[in-house]
From Swiss-Prot:
Binding site for phosphoenolpyruvate: K23, G95, R123, Q170, R347, R389
Protein name as it appears in the record: 3-phosphoshikimate 1-carboxyvinyltransferase
One cellular-component annotation, GO: cytoplasm
Main enzyme class: transferase
InterPro entries with a match to the protein in the record: Enolpyruvate_Tfrase_dom, Enolpyruvate_Tfrase_sf, EPSP_synthase, EPSP_synthase_CS, RNA3'P_cycl/enolpyr_Trfase_a/b
Associated pathway: Metabolic intermediate biosynthesis; chorismate biosynthesis; chorismate from D-erythrose 4-phosphate and phosphoenolpyruvate: step 6/7
Keyword terms of this UniProt record: Amino-acid biosynthesis, Aromatic amino acid biosynthesis, Cytoplasm, Transferase
Localisation: Cytoplasm
EC number(s) recorded for this UniProt protein: 2.5.1.19
CDD domains reported in the protein's UniProt record: EPSP_synthase
Length: 429
């Protein structure tokens, strides 16, 4: 268990950063390339642990994949060309891999067993296995399909019209991917619109997808045709430096090639509402996944209330938003964020516990947290508990704190941002 010591930053963070590739888009590009016909080239791929797990799983199913840094080529097998894996498919720490891949495996006529690490073993799978069972898939797991390992024997599926109790892109994507080989039209309706990378990328691979409000539909029997994918920078990774630029005194940062998919930019809306000073310069208008360069500098923030439809658009950014709120004048309330409880850690409890160790005034609620600003943070020993987003949030907090901050289990950041600590060090010089 590696630890990392963060020293206070006295002269701000300054410089340009090229944000690493979007994790959600990188996963999907590999998966869709694997079930497409032809060769897909992916540029800007995120070579983090989670996305490498996706590559490993599809290689195990006979797909020819070559990865060289942030460039990947995938020679697709088509929807019917995957081979039965000889070994257990290990997703590591990746919830995206196991949930989306389950949708693909559900319609593939062979047996597979899927598992991950200790964190994955605690994460709820029934939200995916239940609708897939309704479509006719033969899926089982611990506690009646609630937890991994999952066993899947795929086969002929029937389309369903599914109303999801949660706004989850992973649930929606698993059902849509299963629907590619189902008989009829598959429809998924959500309580709020979740991130739409799957819909956008399916369209780029030639699949017709219909969107009507909170409902997404596709007809079975459609094939994917290989295409080249340019992955923009991950806005969830950018969020740590956006907040750092806003709250660490004397900072000015230029974040290059940040993905600006409107289902993901809740962090931008929240920082604007809190009073942050930044500019957004679009760089690839018209692309299926928009991107921009963002310049942000230190400013005074004010507390706000965050809840409702915006939550699915910033669910992964809430840990670092909570940190921003500790430096804002007044009270910030985050609500409607129950999903935080079933992430890599229970992020409500983890954020509150670790920021409290640093001197923040913050309390947990059933569906979020209340943060009382403005807090002077003091260095301490804290822990990521194996959660990459907690680790990066604590590193930014350490830059602000008086005295050194030691982060235990710091290597977790490699899941989504392998070069995070090197970038942070470079920007402090």
């Amino acid at each position: 268990m590696k630890e990392r010591t963060i020293q206070p930053v006295n002269n701000g963070l300054n410089g340009n950063i090229t944000i690493p590739g979007d994790k959600s888009i990188s996963h999907r590009a590999v998966m869709f390339g694997a079930i497409a016909e032809g060769k897909t080239t992916i540029k800007g791929f995120l070579p983090g642990a989670d996305c490498l797990s996706t590559i490993s799983c599809f290689k195990e199913m006979g797909v020819d994949i070559v990865q060289n840094g942030d460039e990947v080529t995938v020679v697709g097998k088509g929807l019917e060309g995957l081979q039965e894996p000889k070994a257990i498919l290990d997703v590591g720490n990746s919830g995206t891999t196991i949930r989306l891949m389950s949708g693909i495996l559900a319609n593939t006529p062979f047996f597979s067993c899927v598992q991950g690490d200790a964190s994955i073993a605690k994460r709820p799978m029934k939200r995916v296995t239940n609708p897939l069972k309704q479509m006719g898939a033969n899926i089982d797991g611990r506690e009646e399909g609630t937890f991994t390992p999952l066993t899947i024997r795929g086969g002929d599926l029937k389309a369903i019209e599914y109303t999801s109790p949660v706004a989850s892109a992973q649930v929606k994507s698993a059902i849509l991917l299963a629907g590619l080989r189902a008989e009829g039209v598959t429809a998924v309706t959500e309580p709020h619109i979740s991130r739409d990378h799957t819909e956008r990328m399916l369209e780029a691979f030639g699949v017709k997808v219909t969107r009507e409000g909170k409902t997404v539909k596709l007809a079975g029997g459609q094939k994917l045709t290989a295409t080249d994918v340019q992955v923009p920078g991950d806005v969830s990774s950018a969020a740590f430096f956006l907040v750092a630029g806003a709250i660490i005194p004397n900072s000015k940062l230029v974040l290059q090639n940040v993905g600006m998919n409107p289902t993901r930019t809740g962090i931008i809306d929240v920082l604007e509402k809190m009073g942050a000073t930044f500019t957004v310069e679009p760089i690839n208008e018209g692309a299926s996944e928009p991107a921009a360069n963002i310049t942000i500098e230190t400013t005074s923030l004010k507390g706000i209330e965050i809840g409702g439809d915006i939550i699915p658009r910033l669910i992964d950014e809430i840990p670092v938003i909570a940190l921003a709120a500790t430096q804002a004048e007044g009270i910030t309330v985050i609500k409607d964020a129950h999903e935080l409880k079933v992430k890599e850690t229970n992020r409500i409890d983890t954020v509150v516990a670790e920021l409290t160790k640093l001197g923040a005034r913050i309390e947990a609620t059933d569906d979020g947290m209340i943060i009382y600003g403005k807090s002077a943070l003091k260095g301490n020993t804290v822990n990521s508990y194996g959660d990459h987003r907690i680790g990066m949030m604590l590193a930014i907090a350490g830059c602000l704190a008086e005295g050194k901050t030691t982060i235990e289990d710091a290597e977790a950041v490699g899941v989504s941002y392998p070069t995070f600590f090197e970038e942070l060090q470079r920007l402090t010089k």
